[in-house]
Design a protein with these regions (language model features):
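Catalytic donor-sugar/metal-binding loop of nucleotide-sugar-dependent glycosyltransferases
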Residues: 134-155
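Residues that recognize and position ribonucleotide moieties
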Residues: 69, 103, 129-130, 148
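Acidic donor-binding loop at a coil-to-helix junction in glycosyltransferase catalytic cores
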Residues: 124-135
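Acceptor/aglycone-binding surface of glycosyltransferases and processive sugar-polymer synthases
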Residues: 3-16, 21, 33-121, 157-166, ...
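Acidic metal-phosphate-binding loop of nucleotide-sugar-dependent transferases
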Residues: 29-31
C-alpha cells in the first residue's frame, strides 16, 4: 500500500506486543541497529528519540540524501519549530532532520499518539508518501511528549532505489 501505510500498521502492531520500546526504521540498510545503544538511554528522560543524519563524520559518502533531502528536511524542521515555538524555552523541541525514519518511542508515548496517527492518517496523509515521518513528530509535540534528536550513522542504501522520488525531484530543481 505504501511507506506511510506500512509505518502506521507497524506502529499499531507494535502496541499489540508487550514491548516497552518501539523502534521504527527502514529495511534498506541505511540505518545501523547499533545506534539503538545510543538512542535507548535517552528514553529515561523523554518519550521519543529521533535520529538525525546531519553529522558529517557519521554519514557514508555518496548516500542517497542529496541537497534536496538534506536542506529540505532541515527547512521543514525549522518550520515545525516555529509552529510550536515557546518563548519561555526557546522552543519546545530542537529539530534538524524531520525526514529521518529511524526513531525509538516509549510505549506510553506511542499510546498517547496512536489514535491520532491512525485517524488523521486516513484523512490527511498520502499513504504512499514519506510525510508520515514529520507528521509523527508534530503529533508527538502536540501531545506534549519530550523529544530529543541523536546523531546516527547513515549509510548508502543497499535495498535498491527510493520509491519516494526525491532524487527525481531534486534533479528537476
Amino acid at each position: 500500500k505504501g511507506f506511510g501505510d506500512s509505518c502506521v500498521v507497524g506502529l499499531n502492531e507494535a502496541l499489540k506486543t508487550d514491548a516497552n520500546i518501539i523502534a521504527l526504521t527502514e529495511c534498506d540498510g541505511t540505518y545501523s541497529g547499533s545506534d539503538l545503544q545510543k538512542m535507548i538511554p535517552y528514553l529515561d528522560n523523554c518519550e521519543v528519540v529521533l535520529g538525525t543524519r546531519l553529522i558529517q563524520v557519521l554519514i557514508e559518502k555518496e548516500n542517497q540524501n542529496g541537497i534536496f533531502n538534506t536542506w529540505g528536511n532541515y527547512f521543514i524542521a525549522k518550520l515545525i519549530q516555529l509552529k510550536y515555538f515557546s518563548i519561555q524555552h526557546m522552543g519546545v523541541v530542537s529539530l534538524t532532520d524531520v525526514g529521518c525514519t529511524f526513531r525509538c518511542i516509549r510505549r506510553d508515548g506511542l499510546e498517547k499518539m496512536i489514535e491520532r496517527i491512525t485517524n488523521d492518517y486516513d484523512k490527511k496523509i498520502d499513504k504512499n508518501g514519506w510525510l508520515i515521518i514529520p507528521y509523527l513528530n508534530m503529533i508527538a509535540i502536540e501531545k506534549d511528549l519530550k523529544i530529543v534528536e541523536v546523531p546516527i550513522t547513515f549509510k548508502k542504501r543497499t535495498g535498491g532505489a527510493s520509491k519516494s522520488g526525491a532524487e527525481r525531484k531534486s534533479k528537476g530543481l
